[in-house]
């Protein structure tokens, strides 16, 4: 499924299954993606914060495995405790984003795990990476 140039304001995607969906040039203002299934979802040239806002969208505890964000504005977004294994973040504005306790690992046994993320050309100024395993 594909969505193009749609604007969502104060919309709750919480607990929804949005896996494999593609959003292109969409705007998400003060939206809630908490605990949403965004596995293999693709966001291209999307905006997740309105100019002047001090808080972005919430992705807390979301399943972002193999999700792709390309040329997106994700400043001040909250990714705390999200499953980010295999996430792709390319040319995104992530200023002040909160990744505290985000999980970029795939644990295969008690002592062994693999980490995976593709982060290129992103602005991570002031991003919180506290207790992240990457």
PLM feature segments, named:
Residues 1-134:
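Tandem repeat scaffolds
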């Amino acid at each position: 499924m594909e969505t193009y140039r749609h604007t969502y304001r104060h919309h709750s995607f919480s607990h929804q299954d949005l896996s494999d969906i593609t959003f292109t040039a969409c705007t998400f203002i003060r939206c809630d993606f908490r605990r949403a299934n965004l596995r293999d979802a693709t966001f291209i040239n999307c905006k997740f914060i309105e100019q002047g806002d001090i808080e972005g969208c919430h992705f807390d505890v979301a399943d972002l495995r193999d999700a792709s964000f390309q040329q997106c504005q994700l400043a001040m977004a909250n990714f705390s405790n999200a499953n980010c294994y295999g996430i792709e973040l390319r040319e995104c504005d992530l200023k002040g984003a909160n990744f505290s306790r985000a999980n970029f690992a795939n644990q295969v046994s008690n002592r062994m795990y693999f980490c995976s993320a593709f982060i290129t050309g992103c602005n991570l100024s002031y991003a919180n990476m506290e207790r992240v395993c990457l």
